[in-house]
Each structure stands twice: as structure tokens, then as C-alpha cells.
């Protein structure tokens, strides 16, 4: 097939390479494969060569084996035994390789001539038979099963036969080529075929491998030669057929062309004869236009004829330049010019001959003349006037213009008058002669013979006389015509050629012996030819018209034609008959003249003799006439045979031409087919290339998509890591806020106690101190649960509100029952900016509100003493009315929060004194510093035992359009707070104190056991989930931290109400806490929100993954107060240690996961990580700069961790005054206190529950530390509100130098609302688009823009 040509060429080239390497078996297989694909040139020779070399190699190997065996036999017995074993092994293997049946089947396939015989099928077989037979033979002849020689070739032959016969088109073509007709086979052939199948070889000769191979090879060669001969014969036959068809077609085309040419010539001649053209004379402008026929006009334009004008009798002609084909019109003056002229074209400039043509057309005579030829001698000179042309004059033309007038050449030519009269006379004479002959015959029958002879002689004489008279009359008439027809003579005699045929000379007889010179006759009605004395000229018939004759104008230099070139057989026979008739007439005339002369001389006696002599002469004449007739017949017959022979030759030539044409057409058709196949193949290649290009483009696009997806995944992972860090910070902040609330509760209780103590001191100063001691002892005797034991994550996180860093105005709270009342407040944004109060007067006394900040500049070290108002007042912003209302929160959902605090009565007394005497406080504080510092160790050691019961505040937030509303339960009055900046804060704090009822110890132990079981189950589930996640992340190389899952799966607080005002039924609370029951309600009154709380637990020691588990451990409620008295601290320590160990393990796992993830990112995107590292370096530099700036800006530079005593806080407050000595003392005291705080931190970690906080979660920019402190610590924090800085919320950028500080974390807040659960999240970016700078307040009364 044509499509497999390239593969065949490749196989051929590979076979040649293996042939050069002397690997003949492989080369032979490749050659056969290439031939099967497409029979290329020279493939058969290569196959035969490879087979020959393979046979030689096999024979050489056999000879070598035989020689080796002989040598081994002669060497001795020892060497003979292994050789015999080898020979037997080889023979055994050779015998076992193939059987006789296998060899016979392969030989039968190779010996078969047709594909039908190869498959042992009939010609009329079906496709099913072909497939069945092919499968059966393929199993027998497959090279893996049949090891006989040439089995592989036989298998290939079967395969080729199956491919051809299974395809219907190829099968038909094969049948046509090999002339296989599907006819029913004879019984004899079938019997032979069956015998061959049963017994393929009749003789009992055993074939060896070599003989079988040689026979098969010779048979194959013979078969190939036969096929080649058949192909050559078919090709030759096709070529001959094509040549015959081409010759026939060419002959047919030539005949059609000749016919078309003849028709065109006739049409042109008719058009030329029927048209006339007017020509202007260039010799004189006064000459009228010359009317000329189309033929003459064409000759005139070509330059073959010059026209002689009628009026001026001057010539004009056209001359052409041979080089540039430019035409020049010459007048009569150029006759005298002898030299040539130059061409006037600028590109030519060659000489142009000025010679006039040899032919002249006379307008008057309307005839053409030959210049330079002699006139005949018989022509007399011209005398008289030249007759006018046949055209009517111009005057008569105008009159006769209306009448149609035919051209002259189209009118039938009439005989002249004298010829008509002559013909009438001849007819009359003939009639008279006939009458006389009839009379003579009648007389001869009655008279004697002499009378008959006389009558005959008289009759002959009369006929001779009439013939002579007729000839004389014709000559006289012609002479008169010749006198009438004028001749023009110039320097040389010119012959006149007339249009009328009657004027041609015909007086001379064909038997005239006078010598005549040949002359050229040129006329529009006759073809030119030369006349000689042997040639005859016939007169035209009267009815012959010039229109029917051929008009061929030729130049004078053209050679004349012979009669054989222009006359046919019929014309020659007619001429011969005329010549014979003339001869008879002449003979009769001669005989009659002689007889008359004799009769005059002799006597009439001898009349009989004369008659006999006349008879003899007549007989001779008859014989001669018959001889001439016979001669003419023979000549006609020979000519007819010659004509037929020529026709046959022409017919054969036409056939050959048609064959050649058909051959050429066939070649062209084959070329076109090959060209179309080539185009189709190129198109297929182009389509394949396009498909490959599309696949490549798709692959590239997929790779790009994968790369982009991978980059996006990496970016998303980085973003997730950043989010996780932010979430951890947020959780830390939330814990800090909760501790703030707890500290605020402690502060409120202490504040109430201080009020009671002040009232008692006024009544009885001596008894007040003792009463306070008794109260403290009672509180110590009733131990409470520590704050760290309760899970902080049960309650929702508080947003990073600026309320914790800014002053709050609270309205007077009206309480009917201090144990059951609920106080609430709201913080709202003011639409209009209001004047910010001075640092010393943020909360005025006229509004009856207590402030959490320090007092004015005059009394900077005083402690705030809020007074409880009797009547509530509401501060409302009219510009921002409230839109939403909060529903009441059920008391069942409120949980107690138990905090550990250190109570020091001495510190309280000092604080009270500081409020009264501002000036004396400096000295008192200095004196008390040493005393209080000595008591630090004792106070710190008693932290674990001194427990105080406080109630945790339940917070809920709602926001929409930067506004918030809340209602107090008993009074239903709204309270607002005003801020100096434009930040949005919406918060509602519902503080409700509950008298907790504690259950028995046994119930708590049962609950604790169940909780431990649940923890173990949860840990197992978490481990299983981690394994599944690690298996999933192996393919994708992406790991999501567990912190995000646990944080995202944490349920909302049950007290938070949805935006659709739906009450929360506490389902999550009941599910998360095992065996939780409704808690008894206890009430207490709180009036303030604390700014910060001190912390002692570091984030590095606690892992956030176990935070929820810890929360579940301590989410149950308690009913009995006696339980806490007997609660052992040892059990708590063990439980905490176990939790810490588990947390540390999970922390290590998280670190390992993060490290592995970071390594993958570093490997895959090293370039991006380097850029990020550079950015981080720049950020670290900026952080260092920010820290330095913060240290400079802060008024105090002392930072303390852990439990800070009252002395530390008082010292910090005294730093604001101008006391240099105090600052030195404070620094020393702080250093001592730091050591004690470290010890307290260690003790608290052992005795308290782990809380997820940072080392310094809520550190102020002024340097004051936050943590679990005493009551006075909270007061000091409230005093330090004037030193709080506010930042630009629109930018939302965290100060990188103060990540560990509280206000650096609490820069800006973004509260997000999530459907009904209303999860509150804190982020470091604000949604506000406006950039606003906020003022910074200091105690030195300086205002600066940050």
C-alpha cells in the first residue's frame, strides 16, 4: 500500500544495516517485511542475496561440524566419547525440533501459486471460510510452534493471503490481475486437490532440511519470475492499449480540426466575398474613397498588394518593419527611392525596405496585376477608352441608395450575349443534322450502296463544314472579346487577369504541338498552377458560378501545384473522356478529308474498296478507343486501390495515435492519483501534527494549572499558618480578658469591703481593723476554687475592645436586691466627634460615676474611690439611637468563675490613706516599701491557700451598623458610654452573681472518673484522626493544624443570642459537660470592668490542642461548699501534671508537623522563602526600632511578671511624681520581687489548672505587668489608663516591636457575625476605610499624634 511506503523504506534500511553486520536471518526477515508493506525497488534482489548468504553460512557451519567430528574420531577413544554424545544430542534436538507433517505443510504453502491454494480454499469461498482456514493454518505454522525450515515464510505468506482475500476490493483486484474467474471447479481438479491435501507427496523420498530449503527456494524463484513476466506482459498490454487509444483519439481530433478549419475557411471566404471596405487615398486629399473587397483590403494591410487609385492614377501601399513589426504607409513618391529608410521607433532604429509589392490592384479594372511578367504575343495593344468599373457612379448611388444592391461577387455570373446566340445556332445545326441523317438512312435502305457512300460522304462533308464554321465563329468571338478587354502597359508588360472565366484562353486544342512558355495565373476564383503543352484546360460549364469555386490568393513566389496535388480521380477520368472524344472527332475529320481527296482523284468504281478501307480505319479507331477505355479503367482501378491502401494506412496511423493518446491519458491519470494520494498523506501528517501540538499544548496547560494550584496551595498553607498564629494570639487575648473580668470582680468585692471598712472606721476606728481581720479569716476558712481550675474556653472570646484601654462612664445602677439584681452597660460609637476630656477630668463627679483611671495631675498617686450612686442616670447619644434589644439571659446558663487572689489588709490600709493624703503618700510609700517587701515571701506562699470565691461575668456581643443596645433586667434603662476616638465598640456585660451549690465529694469523684474516661476516648479518636490525616497528606503534602480544627469546631457560648432574637437552649453546654445539672443562682453586684489582670502561666508550658479537653474536665457544676474544704490539693497537682505531660507531647507533635511542612515549602519554593526571610529580617529590624521607641515613649521602664504585691504597684505609681529616691527604691524592690514571682509562678503551675496564655499577654505600653495580682494591683491598673496610647485603626497594622504586649495585640478589632451561632472572632485588621489619627494622653499633660 502507498501509505506504508515509509515504513517499508525504514525496514529496508535496517535490513541493509544488519546485512552489513552479517546478521542474515534478521536482515532477511526485515527485507520480507518491507516487501510485504510495499514492494520497493531492488527488494527482491536483496532478499535473494540474503538467502544465498544464509545458505552459505549454514553449509559452512555444517561442514565445520562434520570436520570437527572427524578430527575428534581420529584423536582417540577419550576424545571420541564426548563427540559422539554431542552428535547424538544434536541429532536428537534436530529430530525433536520439527516433524514431517510440519515440514510438509510449510512446503505446500510455499509451493502454491495463488493465495487460494496457500489457504487451500476454493475460488467461491466466503469470508467465514477464509478466517476459519487461516486460524487453523496459523496454529500449525506459527514460528513458536513450528520449527521447520521456512515455516516463518510460510506463516507470512498465509498472513498476506488472508489480508488480501479478506478485503473485498483487494480480492477483486487480485482476481482480475491473475485472471481468476469464479467458476465451479471440475471433479477431477477437486479429486487432485483432495489427494494433495491427504497425501501432499506421493514418493517415499525423505527430505532433509537442506534439500527442502533448496527446492523451496528454487520454486520461489520460479514463482517470482513468472509473476514478473506476467506483470511485464500486463504492463506492455496496457501500454499498447493506451497507445492505440491515444492514436485513435489523436486521429479523430485531427479530423475534427480539419473539418473545423474547412468550415472556418468557407465562412471566411463567404464573408470576404460578401463584404467591401472603403480606403482613402493618401496621394491627394481630393480623391474620393476607394471601394475594395475584404480580401484585397486584407492583402493591402499585410503589404502584399499596392492599390492604384482611379482618379489620381497613383499607387499606395503598406510596409512592415521586420524587427519591431511597425507599419508604414507609403505613397507613390517612394517608387523613386532606391535606398532603405530607418525605422522611426526609438527602440528599433533599423532599416526598412521601401520596395513596393509585386502585385497591383487596379481600382478601375477591379483586377490584380503581376509586376515584371511578360504579356502573351497574341494580345493586341490597347486602343480606345478604358471602360468604367461595374460600380455605379456616385451620383447614381445616392439615387439608388434606397434600392438594395447586392455585391458583384455574390451575383451569379451570366453568359455574354454572343455566347447565347452561338449556343442557339449550334442547337439549330444539330437539329438539322439529325433530320438529314434520318433522311439519309431512309434513303439508304432503298438505294444502292454507292449512293449510300455518296450520301455518307456528303453527310461527313456537311458535318466537317459545320464544325469548321463553328470553330471559326468561336475564334472570331474570342478575338472580339480580347479586343474589348483592355490591357495596361508600363515600363514592363503586365498581364491582365480578369474575373470572368469565359475570357480565359481556350482556343488551343490539347493536341497542339507548338511550344508554349509556362506562365502564372492568379485569380480569386482559381487555384494557381502552371500550364504546359501536355496539360489541358477545360471550359467551365454555363451554370458554374464563382461563389462555388475556391478563392485562394497566393504570392507570386509560391511554387505552382501539379495536377496530382489538386485533382482527384473523378476529375482525371473526366479529362480523359474529353480527350478521347476530341481524338475521335479529329480522326473522323482526317479520314473524311482523305476519302474526299481520293474520290476526287480516283474513280467511283473503287468505292467499295474505299468503304472497306474506311471500315478498317473505323475498326482500328474503335479498337484504339476500347484500348484507351480499358487503359483508363485499369488506371482508375489502380488509383482506387492506391487510394484504399492510403486510407488503410491513415486509419492505422489514426489508431496508433489514439492508442498513444490513451496511453498518455492513462499516465496522466496515474500521476494525478499519485499526486492526490501524496496530498492526502500530507494532509494526514498535518492533522497528526496538529493533534500532537494540541496534546502538547494541553499538557503544558495542565502542568501550568498544576503548578498554579500547587502555588496556591502553598500560599493557602502559609496563610493558614499565619491565621493559626493570629488565632493563638486571639485565644491568649481572650484568656487575658477573662482574667480581667475576674480581677474586676475581685476589685469590686474589695471595693465593697473597703466601703464597709471606711464606714466602720468612722464609727469605731479601733474595732474596724479587727472586724476586717475577722472577715478575712472567714473568707480563708471557706476556701474557693481557683480561677485557673475553670476552663476559660467554655465562654465566648471577648473582642479586642478599646474599652479595656480607655475610660468608661457608667450610669448609676439602681438595685432592688443586691443578691439578685443584674447590672448591664453598653458602649456605643458617637456619630459626631466630641471634645475629649482632659487627662485629669475624664470622669466628672457631677455625673455620679466612678472612673477606672487615675485622678488629676495634682493628685496623681491617689487611689480611685468610686461611690455608689442612689439613682441611676443614663448617658445617651442622640445621634446614634439604638435599634436592637437583647433578650434576657437565663440564670441557668451563667457559670461561676473561681479565681485565686492574694489579700493583704496592710496594703488596703495603705491604699485608703493614699486617697486622703496625696502629699504624705510619697513618704508613707517609701517607708512601707521595705516592710511590704519583707512580707512578699509569706504572701506568695499563701497564694494556694488563700482562695476567694468570685463570679465570672458572662459576656455577649451583638453588632450591626456600628451600634449596640442592652437593657437592665429590673430597670430596663439604657446606658451609653462616650469615647474620644471613632472606633466601634459594641459590648454588653451581663454580670450575675450566683450562690453556687456544691455537691458531695462522691458525686464529684464519679463525675471526675467519667470525665477521665471521656478524655481517654477523645485522645484515642484524635490519634486515629491524626493517622488518617497523615496518610492523606502524604499524596498532597499538605497538613492542616489541629488547632484550627479544634478552634473551628468549638461551639458558641450558650448565653449569646442570635441576630434573629432566638433564645439559646444550652444544648452544647449540656452535651460537652458530662452529667451537668442546673446550677443554683447566686447574686452579687458588680459595677466596673477591669483593665487588665496579672498572669503567672506562660504559653510555652501549655499547648492549645488540649485546651478544649481541659475545658471539658472542668465544665461541670458544683452544689456543695463543704466539698472544697476537703478537696485535696495533691489530686489537683497530679491531674495537672498528667495534663501538662500530654500537652507537651502534642506540642512536640505539632512542632514536628510544622517543621516538616516548612521543609517541604523550602524545597519547593526556595526562592519565595528567601524573599520572605529577607522581609522577616527587615521586620525584625523594625521591631527593634519599635521597641526602642516604645521604651523611650513609656514613662516607666520596669516590667514585672507574676504576682505583684501592693508595694510594687505603689512604687510604680510614685514613679509618676518627681521623687528620684522612690524610683531607685522601686527598682531594687522590683528586682527582689521578680525573683519571688518566679517562684510563685512555679508553685502556681503545680497547684493550678493550665490556662492558654502568653508570657505577657496583656502588657501595657507604660511597662506595667499584668497577671493574677491583688486588689490594689487592679486599682493601680485603673490609675494607669491615662498613659494608654491609641493607634490608627484604619491601617490595622500591629506594632511589630510589641507583639508580647497587650495593647500591641489589641490594636484593632473586627467582629464577624456567623449565622445563628454568632461566633466572635478577633483579627488584627479593621474594616474601616477612613484613616484617623488618635491622640495620646500622658500624665505630663502632653498631647502628641502617633
UniProtKB/Swiss-Prot annotation:
Region span, Disordered: 57-92, 214-239, 371-570, 746-949, 1026-1090, 1173-1301, 1319-1346
Keyword Coiled coil appears in the UniProt entry: yes
Keywords from the UniProt entry: Coiled coil
Record bears the keyword Flavoprotein: no
Coiled coil: 214-275, 577-742, 999-1034, 1131-1194
Residue ranges with Basic and acidic residues bias: 746-755, 1173-1190
Start-end of Polar residues biased regions: 508-517, 552-566, 812-824, 863-882, 1068-1089, 1244-1259, 1336-1346
Highest taxon of the lineage: Eukaryota
SMART domains attached to this UniProt entry: DnaJ
One Pfam family from the record: DnaJ
A Gene Ontology cellular-component term: endoplasmic reticulum membrane
GO MF, one example: Hsp70 protein binding
Domain J as annotated: residue spans: 114-178
UniProt biased composition (Acidic residues): 1289-1301
Composition skew (Low complexity), residue ranges: 221-234, 403-485, 526-551, 756-782, 843-862, 899-947, 1195-1243, 1263-1279
GO biological process terms, semicolon-separated: cellular response to misfolded protein; chaperone cofactor-dependent protein refolding
Name of the protein this chain belongs to: J domain-containing protein DDB_G0295729
Lineage of producing organism: Eukaryota, Amoebozoa, Evosea, Eumycetozoa, Dictyostelia
Amino acid at each position: 500500500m502507498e501509505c506504508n511506503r515509509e515504513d517499508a523504506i525504514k525496514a529496508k534500511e535496517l535490513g541493509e544495516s544488519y546485512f552489513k553486520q552479517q546478521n542474515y536471518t534478521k536482515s532477511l526477515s526485515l527485507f520480507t517485511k518491507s516487501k510485504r508493506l510495499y514492494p520497493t525497488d531492488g527488494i527482491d534482489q536483496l532478499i535473494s542475496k540474503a538467502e544465498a548468504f544464509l545458505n552459505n553460512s549454514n553449509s559452512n557451519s555444517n561442514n565445520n561440524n562434520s570436520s570437527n567430528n572427524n578430527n575428534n574420531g581420529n584423536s582417540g577413544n577419550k576424545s571420541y566419547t564426548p563427540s559422539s554424545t554431542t552428535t547424538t544430542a544434536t541429532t536428537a534436538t534436530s529430530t525433536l525440533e520439527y516433524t514431517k507433517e510440519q515440514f510438509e505443510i510449510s512446503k505446500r504453502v510455499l509451493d502454491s501459486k495463488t493465495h487460494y491454494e496457500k489457504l487451500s480454499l476454493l475460488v467461491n469461498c466466503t469470508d467465514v471460510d477464509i478466517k476459519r482456514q487461516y486460524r487453523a493454518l496459523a496454529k500449525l505454522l506459527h514460528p513458536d510452534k513450528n520449527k521447520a525450515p521456512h515455516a516463518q515464510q510460510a506463516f507470512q505468506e498465509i498472513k498476506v493471503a488472508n489480508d488480501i482475500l479478506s478485503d473485498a476490493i483487494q480480492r477483486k483486484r487480485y482476481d482480475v490481475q491473475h485472471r481468476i474467474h469464479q467458476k465451479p471447479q471440475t471433479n477431477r481438479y477437486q479429486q487432485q486437490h483432495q489427494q494433495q491435501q491427504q497425501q501432499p507427496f506421493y514418493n517415499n523420498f525423505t527430505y532433509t532440511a537442506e534439500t527442502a530449503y533448496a527446492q523451496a527456494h528454487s520454486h520461489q524463484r520460479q514463482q517470482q519470475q513468472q509473476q514478473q513476466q506476467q506483470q511485464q506482459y500486463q504492463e506492455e498490454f496496457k501500454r499498447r492499449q493506451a497507445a492505440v487509444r491515444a492514436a485513435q483519439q489523436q486521429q479523430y481530433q485531427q479530423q475534427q480540426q480539419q473539418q473545423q478549419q474547412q468550415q472556418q475557411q468557407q465562412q471566411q471566404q463567404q464573408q470576404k466575398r460578401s463584404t467591401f471596405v472603403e480606403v482613402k487615398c493618401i496621394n491627394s486629399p481630393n480623391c474620393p474613397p476607394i471601394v475594395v473587397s475584404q480580401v484585397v483590403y486584407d492583402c493591402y494591410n499585410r503589404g502584399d498588394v499596392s492599390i492604384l487609385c482611379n482618379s489620381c492614377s497613383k499607387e499606395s501601399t503598406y510596409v512592415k518593419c521586420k524587427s519591431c513589426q511597425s507599419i508604414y504607409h507609403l505613397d507613390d513618391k517612394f517608387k523613386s527611392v532606391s535606398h532603405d529608410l530607418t525605422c522611426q521607433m526609438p527602440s528599433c532604429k533599423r532599416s526598412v525596405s521601401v520596395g513596393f509589392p509585386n502585385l497591383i490592384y487596379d481600382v478601375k479594372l477591379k483586377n490584380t496585376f503581376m509586376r515584371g511578367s511578360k504579356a502573351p504575343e497574341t494580345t493586341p495593344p490597347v486602343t480606345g477608352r478604358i471602360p468604367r468599373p461595374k460600380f455605379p457612379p456616385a451620383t447614381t448611388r445616392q439615387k439608388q441608395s434606397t434600392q438594395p444592391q447586392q455585391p458583384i461577387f455574390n451575383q451569379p455570373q451570366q453568359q455574354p450575349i454572343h455566347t447565347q446566340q452561338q449556343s442557339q445556332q449550334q442547337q439549330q445545326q444539330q437539329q438539322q443534322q439529325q433530320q438529314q441523317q434520318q433522311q439519309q438512312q431512309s434513303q439508304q435502305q432503298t438505294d444502292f450502296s454507292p449512293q449510300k457512300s455518296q450520301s455518307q460522304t456528303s453527310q461527313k462533308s456537311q458535318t466537317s463544314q459545320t464544325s469548321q464554321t463553328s470553330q471559326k465563329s468561336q475564334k472570331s468571338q474570342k478575338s472580339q472579346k480580347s479586343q474589348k478587354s483592355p490591357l495596361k502597359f508600363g515600363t514592363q508588360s503586365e498581364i491582365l487577369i480578369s474575373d470572368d472565366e469565359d475570357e480565359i484562353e481556350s482556343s488551343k486544342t490539347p493536341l497542339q504541338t507548338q511550344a508554349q512558355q509556362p506562365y502564372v495565373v492568379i485569380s480569386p476564383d482559381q487555384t494557381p498552377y502552371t500550364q504546359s503543352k501536355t496539360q489541358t484546360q477545360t471550359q467551365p460549364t454555363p451554370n458554374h458560378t464563382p461563389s462555388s469555386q475556391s478563392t485562394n490568393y497566393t504570392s507570386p513566389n509560391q511554387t505552382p501545384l501539379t495536377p496530382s496535388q489538386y485533382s482527384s480521380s473523378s476529375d482525371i477520368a473526366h479529362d480523359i473522356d474529353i480527350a478521347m472524344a476530341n481524338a475521335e472527332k479529329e480522326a473522323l475529320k482526317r479520314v473524311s478529308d482523305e476519302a474526299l481527296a481520293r474520290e476526287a482523284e480516283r474513280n467511283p468504281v473503287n468505292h467499295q474498296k474505299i468503304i472497306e478501307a474506311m471500315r478498317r480505319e473505323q475498326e482500328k479507331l474503335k479498337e484504339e478507343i476500347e484500348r484507351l477505355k480499358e487503359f483508363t479503367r485499369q488506371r482508375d482501378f489502380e488509383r482506387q486501390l492506391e487510394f484504399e491502401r492510403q486510407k488503410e494506412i491513415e486509419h492505422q496511423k489514426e489508431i496508433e495515435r489514439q492508442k498513444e493518446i490513451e496511453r498518455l491519458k492513462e499516465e496522466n491519470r496515474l500521476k494525478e492519483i499519485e499526486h492526490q494520494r501524496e496530498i492526502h498523506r500530507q494532509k494526514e501528517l498535518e492533522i497528526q501534527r496538529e493533534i500532537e501540538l494540541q496534546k502538547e499544548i494541553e499538557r503544558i496547560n495542565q502542568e501550568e494549572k498544576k503548578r498554579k494550584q500547587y502555588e496556591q496551595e502553598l500560599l493557602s498553607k502559609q496563610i493558614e499558618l499565619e491565621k493559626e498564629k493570629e488565632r493563638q494570639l486571639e485565644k491568649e487575648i481572650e484568656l487575658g480578658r477573662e482574667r480581667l473580668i475576674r480581677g474586676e470582680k475581685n476589685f469590686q468585692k474589695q471595693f465593697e469591703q473597703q466601703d464597709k471598712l471606711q464606714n466602720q472606721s468612722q464609727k469605731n476606728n479601733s474595732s474596724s481593723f479587727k472586724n476586717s481581720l475577722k472577715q478575712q479569716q472567714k473568707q480563708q476558712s471557706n476556701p474557693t476554687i481557683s480561677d485557673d481550675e475553670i476552663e476559660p474556653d467554655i465562654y465566648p472570646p471577648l473582642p479586642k475592645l478599646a474599652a479595656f484601654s480607655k475610660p468608661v462612664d457608667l450610669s448609676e445602677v439602681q438595685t432592688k436586691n443586691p443578691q439578685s439584681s443584674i447590672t448591664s452597660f453598653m458602649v456605643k460609637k458617637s456619630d459626631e466627634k466630641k471634645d475629649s476630656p482632659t487627662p485629669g477630668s475624664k470622669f466628672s463627679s457631677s455625673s455620679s460615676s466612678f472612673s477606672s483611671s487615675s485622678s488629676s495631675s495634682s493628685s496623681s498617686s491617689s487611689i480611685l474611690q468610686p461611690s455608689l450612686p442612689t439613682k441611676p442616670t443614663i448617658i445617651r447619644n442622640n445621634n446614634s439611637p439604638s435599634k436592637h434589644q437583647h433578650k434576657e439571659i437565663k440564670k441557668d446558663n451563667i457559670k461561676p468563675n473561681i479565681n485565686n487572689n492574694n489579700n493583704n489588709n496592710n496594703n488596703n490600709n495603705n491604699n485608703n490613706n493614699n486617697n486622703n493624703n496625696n502629699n504624705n503618700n510619697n513618704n508613707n510609700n517609701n517607708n512601707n516599701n521595705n516592710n511590704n517587701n519583707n512580707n512578699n515571701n509569706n504572701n506568695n506562699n499563701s497564694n494556694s491557700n488563700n482562695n476567694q470565691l468570685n463570679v465570672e461575668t458572662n459576656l455577649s456581643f451583638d453588632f450591626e451598623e456600628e451600634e449596640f443596645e442592652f437593657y437592665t433586667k429590673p430597670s430596663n434603662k439604657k446606658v451609653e458610654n462616650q469615647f474620644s476616638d471613632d472606633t466601634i465598640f459594641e459590648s454588653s456585660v451581663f454580670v450575675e452573681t450566683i450562690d453556687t451549690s456544691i455537691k458531695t465529694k462522691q458525686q464529684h469523684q464519679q463525675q471526675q472518673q467519667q470525665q477521665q474516661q471521656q478524655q481517654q476516648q477523645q485522645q484515642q479518636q484524635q490519634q486515629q484522626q491524626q493517622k488518617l490525616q497523615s496518610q492523606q497528606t502524604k499524596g498532597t503534602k499538605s497538613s492542616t493544624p489541629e488547632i484550627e480544627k479544634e478552634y473551628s469546631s468549638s461551639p458558641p457560648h450558650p448565653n449569646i443570642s442570635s441576630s434573629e432574637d432566638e433564645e439559646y437552649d444550652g444544648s452544647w453546654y449540656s452535651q460537652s459537660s458530662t452529667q451537668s445539672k442546673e446550677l443554683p443562682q447566686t447574686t452579687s453586684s458588680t459595677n466596673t470592668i477591669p483593665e487588665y489582670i496579672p498572669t503567672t502561666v506562660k504559653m510555652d508550658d501549655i499547648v492549645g490542642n488540649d485546651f478544649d479537653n481541659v475545658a471539658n474536665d472542668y465544665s461541670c457544676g458544683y452544689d456543695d461548699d463543704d466539698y472544697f474544704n476537703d478537696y485535696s490539693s495533691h489530686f489537683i497537682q497530679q491531674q495537672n501534671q498528667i495534663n501538662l505531660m500530654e500537652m507537651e507531647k502534642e506540642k512536640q507533635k505539632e512542632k514536628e508537623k510544622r517543621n516538616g511542612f516548612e521543609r517541604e515549602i523550602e524545597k519547593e519554593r526556595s526562592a519565595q522563602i528567601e524573599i520572605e526571610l529577607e522581609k522577616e529580617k527587615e521586620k525584625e529590624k523594625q521591631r527593634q526600632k519599635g521597641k526602642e521607641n516604645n521604651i523611650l515613649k513609656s514613662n516607666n521602664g520596669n516590667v514585672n511578671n507574676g504576682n505583684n504585691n501592693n508595694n510594687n504597684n505603689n512604687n510604680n505609681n510614685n514613679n509618676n511624681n518627681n521623687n528620684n529616691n522612690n524610683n531607685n527604691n522601686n527598682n531594687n524592690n522590683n528586682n527582689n520581687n521578680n525573683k519571688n514571682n518566679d517562684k510563685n509562678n512555679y508553685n502556681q503551675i503545680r497547684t493550678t489548672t493550665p490556662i492558654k496564655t502568653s508570657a505577657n499577654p496583656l502588657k501595657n505600653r507604660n511597662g506595667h505587668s499584668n497577671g493574677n495580682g491583688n486588689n490594689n494591683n487592679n486599682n493601680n491598673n485603673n490609675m494607669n489608663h491615662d498613659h494608654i496610647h491609641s493607634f490608627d485603626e484604619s491601617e490595622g497594622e500591629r506594632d511589630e516591636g510589641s507583639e508580647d504586649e497587650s495593647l500591641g495585640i489589641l490594636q484593632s478589632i473586627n467582629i464577624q457575625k456567623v449565622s445563628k451561632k454568632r461566633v466572635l472572632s478577633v483579627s488584627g485588621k479593621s474594616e474601616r476605610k477612613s484613616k484617623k489619627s488618635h491622640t495620646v494622653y500622658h500624665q505630663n499633660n502632653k498631647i502628641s499624634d502617633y
